[in-house]
Amino acid sequence: MASARPPSPEELLAASEKAFEAGRFEEALHRADEAIRRDGRSLAAHHYRAAALAELGRLEEAREAYEAALALDRDDLDLLVGAADFHVNLLQEDEAERDLVERGIALARRGAKLARKADDPALEGEFRRLEAAGLNQLGLSREALRVLQDAEAALPDSVEVMLEKGFALYELCRFGEARAALLRAEALDRDEPWTQHYLGLVAERAGDEEEARRRFGRARKLDPDAFPKPIALSPEAFDAAVEDALASLPDAVRRYLSNVAITVEDHPSDDDLLAPDPPLSPAILGLFRGAPYGQKASMDPWSHFPSAIVLYQRNLERFARTRAELIEQIGITLIHEVGHFLGLDEDELWARGLE
């Protein structure tokens, strides 16, 4: 009896695609690996392998798989979309790594250039949106807004473009414009949880607590994993959490903090946010006020005031589901602000792991 004919690389690719579209990512990965064993230079197989690994949460393997695919063809538009999206979105869900975000931006820019040559304005617009997402990740929201002008012109009905625009405007403290962009996104898709979340943040800044609660609640209903109910403490309980966080810090950090007043406010004030140019993010967890350590002789009159670190309770509470998580985040924030007290800028903080 003749043995069954082994599936061809094309059949394995079709099986991988079918499994991927059905959400069976382990099977999709298995079929893609089989296809690669049959044809090691199959770009589609390498792409499916990378995408399946990403969906399975095996992010470092997925990053390596995307690089292997790009080594085969760095000009394939479908691959560039997937790789750029992976670097600026999925890979950054927990915490942005600057070099990886920059890699995603570079891929998006290359894709936009190739899409323009191919006379595909919609695809060029998608690449520009991904570039803007990466720029927003790096805190370069003004540059992101400029890029989003091209994306919006190409994709005027894109929820993702309007949401990214709303996020950039929010980060730049242009809250009225942010609300307008987010309402446009909501009109296109009422069930996008991130739109509801950012509308809640804008309402909170405006002092509309009722709308903020409604928006946050809707975001939580639409995506409870992304938007769990935050811990909410009384001022006294929050102060106690700060004390516990201080007690958990290394001696060297506590020694520096002995020279710094620590205060708590609900939200950053407009004055604090708009003092630098570009403005600070409204989502900041803390802020160092005063002159860095050893610079009290500055001609700046503000430097003669005592140094202080302000913790923003509502922003910190959004990062925590439990008191233990809140204490941990307060400690991280204090260490970050100690870096500012020591005169480190944002790039130096990032390099030292204090960002």
Tell what function each PLM region has.
Residues 38, 72, 114, 118, ...:
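Structural marker of alpha-solenoid helical repeat scaffolds
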Residues 103-110, 187-193, 197, 201-228:
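TPR/TPR-like (Sel1-like) alpha-helical repeat modules
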Residues 282-331, 341-355:
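Active-site scaffold of zinc-dependent metalloenzymes
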